[in-house]
């Protein structure tokens, strides 16, 4: 049941909103495709490094550590060392 206050599809504001929504969705889809391509490239680099004899787990750890703030990383390393000492691991 339509009401007199219903918005018509051919009104300029409705067309603008539809076009804008379509543009947003298409941008998101394009970025998702780019993200997948980048993810595939990263996986290929790790595979290449493994083929060259590097430890992928260590490389991932280094990449993650380099993203951290130096002070936060130092604090985390200190805590880890403290726990390891308490457990007799070092």
Swiss-Prot record:
Domain of life: Bacteria
InterPro entries: GapR-like, GapR-like_DNA-bd
GO molecular function, one term: DNA binding
Family: Belongs to the UPF0335 family.
NCBIfam families, per database record: PRK13694.1
Stated name of the protein: UPF0335 protein bsl7135
Protein species of origin: Bradyrhizobium diazoefficiens (strain JCM 10833 / BCRC 13528 / IAM 13628 / NBRC 14792 / USDA 110)
């Amino acid at each position: 049941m339509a009401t007199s206050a219903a918005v018509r599809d051919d009104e300029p504001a409705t067309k603008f909103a539809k076009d804008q929504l379509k543009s947003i969705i298409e941008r998101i889809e394009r970025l998702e495709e780019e993200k997948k391509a980048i993810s595939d490239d990263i996986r290929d680099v790790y595979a290449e490094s493994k083929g060259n004899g590097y430890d992928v787990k260590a490389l991932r750890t280094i990449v993650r550590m380099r993203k951290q703030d130096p002070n936060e990383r130092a604090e985390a390393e200190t805590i880890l060392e403290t726990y390891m000492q308490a457990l007799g691991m070092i």
